[in-house]
Amino acid sequence: MSLFNVFRKEIEWGGRKLVLETGRIARQADGAVMASLGDTTVLCTAVGAKTKSKFDFFPLTVNYQEKTFAAGKIPGGFFKREGRPSEKETLVSRLIDRPIRPLFVHGYKNETQLVCTVLCHDLENNPDIVAIVGASAALTLSGLPFLGPIGAARVGLIDGAFVLNPTRDQMADSVLDLVVAGTREGVLMVESEAHELSEQQMLDAVMFGHEGYQPVIDAIIALAEQCAREPRAIEPPAPEAEAVAAKVREVGEAGLRDAYKEADKMVRHDKVDAVRDAVTAAFAGDDAALALAGAAFKDLEKDIVRGSILDTGLRIDGRDTKTVRPIEIYPGILPRAHGSALFTRGETQALVTTTLGTGQDEQIIDALEGEYRENFMLHYNFPPYSVGEAGRMGSPGRREIGHGKLAWRAIHPMMPAKDAFPYTVRVVSEITESNGSSSMATVCGTSLALMDAGVPLKNAVAGIAMGLIKEDERFAVLSDILGDEDHLGDMDFKVAGTANGITSLQMDIKITSITKEIMNVALNQAKDGRIHILGEMTKALGNARSDVSDFAPRITTIKVPPQKVREVIGSGGKVIREITEVTGTKIDIEDDGTIKIASADAEATQRAVDWIKGIVAEPEIGVVYTGKVVKIMDFGAFVNFLGTRDGLVHISELSQDRVKKVGDVVNVGDQVKVKCVGFDDRGKIKLSMKQVDQVTGADLSTQAPAEE
């Protein structure tokens, strides 16, 4: 008799086999599913604590991890084991979290953890989609109060046609990389990068993905019908909850309504805090009621703000639903930075800098798919002072990594090709003030800072964050949302792009799903806002600077025959090290013979260019060269010239006068001018000093004899 009671569901999905299996591995987890697409396999587990946590929020943790053995590799580094999460692992963890979090039953606060481990990667099917599907299945089987399942799919656009779950090779030809996840009824999450696609194309792609993942939802339901655990009993609301909510409304409603008429964020928050203190004081001595009052206070805030917007069409700061906050822009604000811009929109501000480097500055990324280099980096920082708080400063958190990647996706399609602009580019966005949509301020500031640095973007890029308030059939889509509107609303919908189309779309829904109609309204309203912001950006800086900063390295590219690369590098890198040390330049050499020389000093660059050209040049008969005596023999002197080449100046070619001893004319280390006069039968170079004026370098053999 087998130890395992295995249940398995297998479907054909997008031309490949999707397999969901449970009962064999991780049987002590509440839910465990081995999900496979092709030969890419991810183990997804879900565990929920049996008791309610002490937190007033839902403590859900999602950990996505890639094991190097999945691709037949051993980790690098001294310890030879996996360490802290990579950027991709962090991003995929967020990708799984976002569509799952809103589907847990309201009020469920038990600590819950999802772990998705990549066990096998066929280097064809991306494991992120497999992980989302597996996580959804594990939760559906677990008995936890999860209102799923959800499905997920990747959508590509190749030769004008949408492709469901394109392979890695197919993605190289796609102008769209879109991940969509949601329920049978609607979409919960979108993450994408696009090459200036229209609003209609993006909407069609989302709906194509929504339709594409329906078979996955059916498969998970079919599996759950066979083996799902009994649903956990949910703790009912406390009997006194209604009475507490009524008292919170009685004490706090008037003060909150007054507070949310205040346009200034800091003043508004002070007023809200004062009302919260009054509510807390009203429950002094009743710890049980006080524990319920916090949630009731948040519900009251939501009712007031949301109701006001739906009833009046006016928002917290007095704007209507479509107006963008005032914008002020200062390009080139930091004189020594290679490029910079200060972008301020209302109470949200980003100080963005661009730094230009060489190929040696590229980021080397060791992924399961193999090592590759990235020459465009964008880093987003959110210090606590940006929201008027004192807090921990340290390495970037998941949110900072996610916001930076969103801005990177928005800008990346507009970056120039590497052969047209051979720099490594690093952008840093410091959020110095924040009241909503700081990631979109980063997009705008990045576009401006890149143009200020002389980076020839194909088109300027702007971004805008949209929000949603929905009650039954009534809804309002909000342009350029505030932080409070994001917190109290139902949707975070970020759109970035150019005047020609969308380059990035990110959507997160806090309710069970939204309709195609709402997405269509949001996309078109976002376009109007984006065009307005681009107009403001154009007023400040219409085009990229014609040249890079005086403080940035100048990169000169030359081409040498591939077979000459070894000569330029030299034995053990000796030659190239000498060139860089003597000239003070940075030099990158590629196998195809492309050499990039970088320096802020034009003269240093030219010296390095001349040096390299000298190394790869072939000696020509009749041409005069400058060289150095490297060895003396009885029959002549060996002179090094053209980098690594040596030639012999025979004793008879040292001087017009008769020479008895070579050392009478030259010594080792002397700089001399020599003329190539031919090659011997073994191909060795024959040189002459007597045919060259050692002062001027003139070729004496071409001058007419003096008249007597």
Swiss-Prot record:
Recorded hits in CDD domains, A to Z, give: KH-I_PNPase, RNase_PH_PNPase_1, RNase_PH_PNPase_2, S1_PNPase
Classification via SUPFAM superfamilies: Eukaryotic type KH-domain (KH-domain type I), Nucleic acid-binding proteins, Polynucleotide phosphorylase/guanosine pentaphosphate synthase (PNPase/GPSI), domain 3, Ribonuclease PH domain 2-like, Ribosomal protein S5 domain 2-like
Q: What does the entry list as the binding residues for Mg(2+)?
A: D486, D492
**A Pfam family of this chain:** KH_1
Q: What Enzyme Commission number(s) apply to this enzyme?
A: 2.7.7.8
Read off the InterPro entries from this record.
Answer: ExoRNase_PH_dom1, ExoRNase_PH_dom2, ExoRNase_PH_dom2_sf, KH_dom, KH_dom_type_1, KH_dom_type_1_sf, NA-bd_OB-fold, PNPase
A single GO cellular-component term from the record reads: cytosol
Task: Give all residue intervals belonging to the S1 motif domain.
Answer: 622-690
**Residue ranges annotated for the KH domain, each copy included:** 553-612
- Which prosthetic group or cofactor does it need? Mg(2+)
Catalytic activity, per the record? Answer: RNA(n+1) + phosphate = RNA(n) + a ribonucleoside 5'-diphosphate
> A GO molecular function for this record?
3'-5'-RNA exonuclease activity
GO BP terms, alphabetized:
mRNA catabolic process; RNA processing
Is-annotated flag, keyword RNA-binding? yes
Protein's cellular compartments? Cytoplasm
Which key words are in the record? Cytoplasm, Magnesium, Metal-binding, Nucleotidyltransferase, RNA-binding, Transferase
Function summary: Involved in mRNA degradation. Catalyzes the phosphorolysis of single-stranded polyribonucleotides processively in the 3'- to 5'-direction.
Q: Which family does it belong to?
A: Belongs to the polyribonucleotide nucleotidyltransferase family.
Q: What is this protein called?
A: Polyribonucleotide nucleotidyltransferase
Q: Which organism is it from?
A: Rhodospirillum rubrum (strain ATCC 11170 / ATH 1.1.1 / DSM 467 / LMG 4362 / NCIMB 8255 / S1)
Q: Per UniProt, what is the name of the gene that codes for the protein in this document?
A: pnp
